[in-house]
């Protein structure tokens, strides 16, 4: 359906757009193209047929620029951080990237940007492409390694040769990328503590400035979830998963990295600014199919389908709009801030938290899952091991 026709979701969002005075802190771009769907991935992605791929890439790039023009004008957005995810952003041809970044520069959308991150898979990294990205303003890359063990990559249905990760990083450095994140996954079926330690050895040997290390989750509507239901994979048990996380904590501290969020570590002074914006309740807009936005208590999501996205112009095909109540916003702010290792200032907690949540904070503190350190409420070391469950109690 064309967005020029009646759209109930858009009608709900219109008051936000018309009256919005909030500053836009970040921009997320979703590039949906992949050459293969990994079995654990629940992000929207498509594998274009070879016969129509080039046309699809060009149509998508033009439509993304069009949507950005609409978003930037409506929200008077001057983002400080941009994150490009997918899909596989580096699967998009260099010419399309050149057109996209040139348009963003010409329109002044990059004027205030201090961090522009692009996700990359090792098998799609070339020097020519990275030269184009860096010339267009990209200054940070997130490398999707996931593991350096061929057995575990096969379990995840990742198709790259683990040796390509080092080569891709070398190319990125030569192109001028001085700020690199490495993505890893632990608690993969069949993975041992020794395997996790070896993955850490490899990641640290790359000289990475940042590490994102998430435990494998079995998301609905993924091949991995189906395999679990059919008994084709055996998940890592909770005790082993906790031991893996404790090993990661110890190894990263020993390597001089700052543990600034439950699943993220950085060299001093190099946390991911875009993700910090999420965790500190910033405002952001998203562009591309399935992209989500969060502005002044409103959340909305673009339709996760390329066809309807390409068929529209201007305002995106929005399918979900949620206006958070004051109660919901308090819960979300508390939950997001407590993902940070520093936590949330106790003065802010006292202002925000109602009696029910204060009782819950006291209970979790008594259970040694929360603590107050230096004027901040934060997760304890014990709380980190069950962070999602603890934070869920505060919603």
Residue spans for each PLM region:
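A short, conserved structural fragment
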Residues: 365-375
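Minor-groove-contacting beta-hairpin "wing" of winged helix-turn-helix DNA-binding domains
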Residues: 376-380
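Flexible, acidic/Gly-rich N-terminal and inter-domain linker regions that tether
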Residues: 1-28, 35-36, 61, 367
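C-terminal scaffold of the Radical SAM
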Residues: 17-26, 45-72, 78-353
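An alpha-helix initiation/capping motif
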Residues: 242, 354-355, 381-384
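Local cysteine-cluster metal-coordination motifs and their immediate loop/turn environment
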Residues: 32-45
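Short amphipathic alpha-helical interaction segments
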Residues: 351-366
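Short, amphipathic alpha-helical interaction segments positioned at domain boundaries
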Residues: 382-395
